[in-house]
């Protein structure tokens, strides 16, 4: 069956250490817990979309190791097509997550994610071309983004995380950009992240993206800037957040889900804010991602107007 959503991105083994505070340079601190789990922005977004009821295919890479086999199994358990997940001659990617309740600081070693390039996307060009939505991030080589931009015919969403410079001709080929404050600053070459909504909007104007931009603002919600329309502030849902690790990834998946459901950008961002807020009420990355039934108890899969 043809997937509705293709995610081209990273697959990592997450090692999450619970700390009271992030250590300073040269300092050692003790962790109060260690959790190993599947992760990577690509995996998180794929699982998030699948749990919202979408048919999802993953294009990525893992190593020929226990972590890689565990990641494949985790995706298959979610009903995700892993035919596009290559086995690389290098270890599965690793992310060390320092969790400082509820925020996280993350260090990534790409490992097998380094082979997710133009050639790999080319092998799976038919799936990318035929998908109704394609989600990308920046934990894989830039060539993968170029290939998606040249191949996809559906809605393309780029989450430029982690914050790296993305050439204008690449980012402009994506319909929707979903940066956070820091990533937005990196895209425009600013030396500091924007504080106020006015500063965020000014940076979006500087970015001059021909498509839509949705800037995620954590507890402040999101600023939605549709192409050719006035910006709209979308408030965050009030929840007792315990872990924000996968909030941005679930937001991106839910935004695409809302657009595919027929919502406009603002409606879809409201739905994404709802999904992201729910994500923060549970611990972990993949483990925290909600199902549609968790959010719509009366059977309405995407209550965009609620």
Describe each model-derived feature in a short phrase.
Residues 1-61, 68-70, 241, 305-306:
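Glycine-rich phosphate/adenosyl-contacting loop at the front of the ribokinase-like
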Residues 1-5, 165, 169, 190, ...:
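Conserved phosphate-binding/catalytic region of the ribokinase-like
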Residues 47, 94-98, 105-106, 221-225:
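Short beta-strand scaffold segments in enzyme catalytic cores
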Residues 61, 87, 97-133, 138:
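Conserved phosphate-binding/catalytic loop of the ribokinase/pfkB sugar-kinase fold
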Residues 66-78, 97, 102, 106:
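Active-site-proximal loop->helix
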Residues 74-89:
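A glycine-rich helix N-cap at a beta->alpha junction
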Residues 79, 114-119, 156-163, 234-236:
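Short gly/ser/thr-rich secondary-structure transition/capping motifs
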Residues 132-202, 212, 220-222:
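Conserved beta-alpha-beta core of the PfkB/ribokinase-like small-molecule kinase fold
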């Amino acid at each position: 069956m043809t997937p509705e959503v293709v995610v081209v991105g990273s697959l990592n083994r997450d090692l999450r250490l619970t700390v009271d505070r992030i250590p300073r340079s040269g300092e050692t601190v003790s962790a109060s817990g260690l959790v190993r789990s599947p992760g990577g922005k690509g995996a998180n977004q794929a699982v998030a979309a699948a749990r919202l009821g979408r048919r999802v295919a993953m294009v990525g890479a893992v190593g020929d190791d226990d972590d890689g086999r565990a990641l494949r199994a985790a995706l298959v358990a979610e009903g995700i097509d892993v035919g596009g997940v290559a086995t690389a001659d290098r270890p599965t990617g690793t992310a060390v997550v320092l969790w400082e309740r509820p925020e996280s600081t993350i260090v990534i070693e790409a490992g097998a994610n380094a082979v997710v390039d133009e050639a790999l996307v080319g092998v799976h060009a038919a799936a990318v071309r035929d998908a109704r939505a394609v989600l990308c991030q920046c934990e894989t080589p830039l060539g993968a983004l170029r290939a998606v931009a040249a191949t996809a015919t559906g809605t393309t969403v780029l989450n430029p995380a982690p914050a790296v410079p993305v050439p204008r001709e690449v980012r402009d080929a994506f319909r929707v950009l979903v940066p956070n404050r820091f990533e937005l600053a990196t895209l425009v070459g600013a030396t500091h992240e924007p504080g106020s909504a006015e500063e965020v909007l000014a940076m979006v104007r500087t970015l001059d993206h021909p498509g839509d931009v949705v800037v995620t603002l954590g507890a402040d919600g999101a600023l939605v800037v549709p192409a050719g329309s006035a910006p709209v502030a979308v408030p965050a849902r009030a929840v007792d957040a315990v872990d924000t690790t996968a909030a941005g990834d679930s937001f991106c998946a839910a935004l695409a889900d809302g657009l595919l459901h027929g919502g406009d950008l603002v409606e879809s961002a409201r739905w994404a804010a709802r999904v992201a807020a729910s994500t923060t009420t549970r611990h972990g990355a993949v483990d925290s991602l909600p199902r549609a039934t968790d959010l719509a108890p009366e059977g309405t899969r995407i209550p965009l107007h609620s």
